Amino acid sequence: MIFDPKMLQVYLVGGTQDVHNDVVKFLEKVELAMKSGITAFQYREKGNSKLRPNERVDLGLELRTLCTHYGIPLIVDDDYELAQQINADGVHVGQNDTKIEQVSVAVGHQMFIGYSCNTPEQVERANTMDFIDYIGCGPVFPTKSKSDADTAIGINRLERLNMISERPVVAIGGIDEENMKVVHDTGVAGLAVISLVFDSKDLVATVKKMKNLYK
């Protein structure tokens, strides 16, 4: 699948740890989100996940089937070997994950690559790497979804990072229904969320509100 910045508009991130390690519930919520209009899904099995390596592959293959059915790109967080095993469309790499250059060499042109950047220096460095397709910036606000989350960067820095970046930017971290518009209005290409969707009492309506921002 060829990368398109529009893929970033309604970008759902998650793993079984986000639904109390209930695999069935996880797949049900992901599929409902796909039916409702998310534009990308990132498989992120971290934190309190209880899945063994082989179970991660099996679940990844089920996600691959769902993403293909709904025409949505499947992105894997950090683990490029898992991404290759399940034929993912992309891989997302954090500053503290596997070295971005190593990932680029491993996946070549088989997948698009996202890279987390939270400072102007990190963005400027990313601008020099032609193999990076998009940048993830955050957490914009404090978040409980990631146990290893950095300090919140705030709206002003997000806006600055978006201006500096030569790649499309997706914002993540602490985004909710109250602040999603102010995040969108910074000019970012998309919003990435975890708990906003997985914890929503009306998942369909939540996804539609996000989609409406980019109409």
Swiss-Prot record:
Keywords: Magnesium, Metal-binding, Thiamine biosynthesis, Transferase. Mg(2+) binds at residues 78, 97. 4-amino-2-methyl-5-(diphosphooxymethyl)pyrimidine binds at residues 42-46, 77, 116, 146. The keyword rRNA-binding does not apply. Binds 1 Mg(2+) ion per subunit. GO terms for molecular function: magnesium ion binding; thiamine-phosphate diphosphorylase activity. It is an enzyme of class 2 (transferase). Pfam families: TMP-TENI (PF02581). Its cofactor is Mg(2+). Coiled coil: none annotated. Its EC number is 2.5.1.3. Pathway: Cofactor biosynthesis; thiamine diphosphate biosynthesis; thiamine phosphate from 4-amino-2-methyl-5-diphosphomethylpyrimidine and 4-methyl-5-(2-phosphoethyl)-thiazole: step 1/1. It catalyses: 2-[(2R,5Z)-2-carboxy-4-methylthiazol-5(2H)-ylidene]ethyl phosphate + 4-amino-2-methyl-5-(diphosphooxymethyl)pyrimidine + 2 H(+) = thiamine phosphate + CO2 + diphosphate; 2-(2-carboxy-4-methylthiazol-5-yl)ethyl phosphate + 4-amino-2-methyl-5-(diphosphooxymethyl)pyrimidine + 2 H(+) = thiamine phosphate + CO2 + diphosphate; 4-methyl-5-(2-phosphooxyethyl)-thiazole + 4-amino-2-methyl-5-(diphosphooxymethyl)pyrimidine + H(+) = thiamine phosphate + diphosphate. GO terms for biological process: thiamine biosynthetic process; thiamine diphosphate biosynthetic process. 2-[(2R,5Z)-2-carboxy-4-methylthiazol-5(2H)-ylidene]ethyl phosphate binds at residues 143-145, 174, 194-195. InterPro entries: Aldolase_TIM (IPR013785), ThiamineP_synth_sf (IPR036206), ThiamineP_synth_TenI (IPR022998), TMP_synthase (IPR034291). SUPFAM superfamilies: Thiamin phosphate synthase. GO terms for cellular component: cytoplasm. HAMAP family: TMP_synthase. Belongs to the thiamine-phosphate synthase family. NCBIfam families: thiE. Condenses 4-methyl-5-(beta-hydroxyethyl)thiazole monophosphate (THZ-P) and 2-methyl-4-amino-5-hydroxymethyl pyrimidine pyrophosphate (HMP-PP) to form thiamine monophosphate (TMP). This is Thiamine-phosphate synthase. It comes from Limosilactobacillus reuteri (strain DSM 20016) (Lactobacillus reuteri).
